[in-house]
Amino acid sequence: KSGETYQIKICTKYRLKSAIDPLDFFCRLSKTNLAPEAFMIRDKDYSIISCSPENLITKKGSLITTKPIAGTVRKNKRMNKIKALSYFRNNLKETKEHNMIVDMERSDMSRICKVGTVKLSKEKAVEEYKDLFHYVSLIKGKIKKNIKNIDIIKAMMPGGSVIGCPKISTLNLLNNQEKENRNIY
């Protein structure tokens, strides 16, 4: 129906069976994909490997931060950091998408943070990675008393940059469109 979502990010799950040791694969991936956020979960029957520049949740004491990424441009000889910033700021689609994701993440944080503490500490900056420039913001807040880690995860997940906006109606649309639930994704 018209008007149910502003943006939807559909994905496809891939599975592979391989003789490659998951830990070896993770180590190789970490060397070639220099993403600051990476993890590996190894179970008896499966492994989950993730490498991403995006940080959905960081908690230190009563402080929580999130760093949404909405905007990516490939590095090349003509695209440096200053040109990337100009590209993002002058591209209406990139700016609107970034604002939408930042607003959604601030709203999610407001459910678990003390009133008036959710603030943008870095707004619309360009971060440089090996092959890409990303358009990022950093949001901080102070967690309310009696909020448990599971409450934080429930409030913040899934992140807006991987599903779209608004969160609840977009999740409902995704559940009807995608062949499998995203689970760990």
Role assignments for model-derived ranges:
Residues K1-Y185:
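Extended alpha-helical targeting/anchoring segments
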